[in-house]
Swiss-Prot record:
Transmembrane segments: none annotated. Belongs to the glutaminase PdxT/SNO family. GO terms for cellular component: cytosol; glutaminase complex. PANTHER family: PYRIDOXAL 5'-PHOSPHATE SYNTHASE SUBUNIT SNO, PYRIDOXAL 5'-PHOSPHATE SYNTHASE SUBUNIT SNO1-RELATED. GO terms for biological process: glutamine catabolic process; pyridoxal phosphate biosynthetic process; pyridoxine metabolic process. The gene is pdxT. GO terms for molecular function: glutaminase activity; pyridoxal 5'-phosphate synthase (glutamine hydrolysing) activity. It comes from Frankia alni (strain DSM 45986 / CECT 9034 / ACN14a). The active site is at residues 81, 175, 177. This is Pyridoxal 5'-phosphate synthase subunit PdxT. SUPFAM superfamilies: Class I glutamine amidotransferase-like. Pfam families: SNO. Keywords: Glutamine amidotransferase, Hydrolase, Lyase, Pyridoxal phosphate. It catalyses: aldehydo-D-ribose 5-phosphate + D-glyceraldehyde 3-phosphate + L-glutamine = pyridoxal 5'-phosphate + L-glutamate + phosphate + 3 H2O + H(+); L-glutamine + H2O = L-glutamate + NH4(+).
Length: 199
């Protein structure tokens, strides 16, 4: 049985690293740059990068509205760092014209932990991930300022939610693709399979 085809939005960010994590857990990574490709994948990863830039690129490549429609239609999506911001309902300190995909009933704060020099690493217990704590890398990371009742908080740093799930949507403020630990990718692939999208 072949693994699910998981698209990776390949406009900016850690595309290769996410592809490696997905391959490690038996998925088939596919780079996505066009709206038509969304119909060819069982799930989608929104990698880290700069959320405002990625949002603008989504508009340039005419992907924003198709992505919103895909999320509403139930496409499983995993957003890390900037991807978490893009999946939020609102951003506290974002630009007023920040394009968002939405889908997660939450408000996030960009760069909540500070600037690049304030980046840090920490071991986190993540609900749904078995084994030792997940080593999490935070780089100009957001956090969840407010989450709706349907949002399940999977991990926190100093009481701030940094990993969440709502239905088939998963988001982390940290970069699981940078550590060589593919358990967050495994969690997402399990979500894809349980949603009926996976092969």
């Amino acid at each position: 049985m072949s693994g699910p085809r998981i698209g990776i939005l390949a406009l900016q960010g850690d595309v290769r690293e996410h592809a490696r994590g997905l391959t490690d857990v038996g998925a088939q990574p596919v780079e996505v740059r066009r709206a038509a490709q969304l119909a060819e994948v069982d799930g989608l990863v929104l990698p880290g990068g700069e959320s405002t830039t990625i949002g603008r690129l989504l508009q340039v490549f005419e992907l924003l509205e198709p992505l919103r429609a895909a999320v509403v239609a139930g496409l499983p999506v995993f957003g890390s760092c900037a991807g978490m911001i893009l999946l939020a309902r609102d951003v506290v300190d974002g630009r007023p014209d920040q394009p968002l995909i939405g889908g997660l009933d939450m408000v996030v704060r960009r760069n909540a932990f500070g600037r690049q020099v304030d980046s840090f690493e920490v071991d986190l217990d993540v609900d749904g991930v078995e084994g030792p704590p997940v080593h999490a890398v935070f780089i100009r990371a957001p956090w969840v300022e407010k989450a709706g009742d349907a949002v399940e908080v999977l991990a926190r740093v100093a009481e701030a939610p940094v990993a969440v799930r709502q239905g088939s949507l998963l988001a982390t403020a940290f970069h699981p693709e940078l550590t060589g630990d593919s358990r967050m990718h495994r969690l997402f692939v399990d979500i894809v399979r349980s949603s009926g999208s996976g092969r």
